[in-house]
Amino acid sequence: MKKLSYSSSGVSINKGNKFVSEIKKIIRKDKNLKKSNIGGFSGQFVLDSKIKKPILVGATDGVGTKIEIARMMRDHKTIGIDLVAMCVNDLIVDQAKPLFFLDYISTGKLDISKGKEIIGGIIKGCKMSNCSLLGGETAEHPEVDSNDKYDLAGFCVGVKSGVAKASPKLRENDIIVGISSSGLHSNGYSLVRKIIKENKIKLNKKIEKNKTIGELLLKPTEIYVSPILEMYTKKIIKTCAHITGGGITENLPRSLNKNVSAKINLETFSLPTIFKWIQSFGVSQNEMLKTFNCGYGMIVILDRTKLNQFEKSIKSHKLKYSIIGNLVNSKKINKKVSYIGKLNFND
């Protein structure tokens, strides 16, 4: 009888151990990641005793089919930043400071070089978010995933003090401000890939100065941790919404009270080139608004009297913004988000 082994079924324990060793080398070089316990059964984190009435807040997310763009471009250095960003940007909406992050990588066949690029991005994202990479899991799934493909999931825990869920005091005429995104972030890529496939588009085609389509699509998701937490602490903003899958249309209502609705002026939008390029293939305005962030990765709501403080704070973080609308009484409008004007898709 032929002897069977785990490696003969397509899973290499030795390669997995080597990958963990490579990650440990990276971790040891970075003093900011000293809390990490890569290779252990679990990770531990000591909560700061100075935090009054601590409440732990958790978030989990992935990066969708943006991974396929990274694979097509053979560039996996920033996809890990996206993974961290998608989780921490959700946490900060609820005023939680990111504490630690864990990752999960699933692949048909482990490629150590590719894996190091992915982990390198995750580490960079954690540093940008001021949180620890506490651990993770890398799994080979032969015959389930194809050899050159992989998927990612991230898990982040943060902390805040006070009540578990306080409803913000939103009022009519409060200002709605869009904070600029770096691009598509990590949503809408299935539609983008359909456009690329059906139109036989080459990712090395230049559409913006010296930037190719592939480079614009791979721009890592903006991490808003520092500016948003700063503005919450200084009571500059009342609430915010992370604009992900579902676009402004689906995400902004999640941060609104039942007594108010959002009125958005599309004429105020400054659309980056990549969104104009996508729309040029016949994507309607409504579809754009409920699929993509359309240039604003985070939307904040504030009292008009706080505008000067907001401008000073956001400029110190070198982020661009636009006042895109205001809140109205829900009795005056039958939608949680209504739009006036049209997006300018022309150059």
Put a short name on every predicted segment.
Residues 2-9, 25, 114-132, 145-152, ...:
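Glycine-/charge-enriched secondary-structure boundary and capping motifs
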Residues 7-13, 28-32:
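N-terminal basic, low-complexity leaders that serve as flexible interaction/assembly modules and, when applicable
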Residues 20, 51, 64, 140, ...:
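Residue-level detector of flexible, active-site-proximal loop/helix-junction positions
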Residues 27-182:
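Glycine-rich phosphate/pyrophosphate-binding loop regions near the starts of catalytic domains
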Residues 49, 105-106, 183, 247, ...:
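Short, glycine/serine-rich, charged loops/turns that create anion-binding
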Residues 151, 164-209, 249-252:
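Short, acidic (Asp/Glu-rich) active-site segment that either coordinates a divalent metal cofactor
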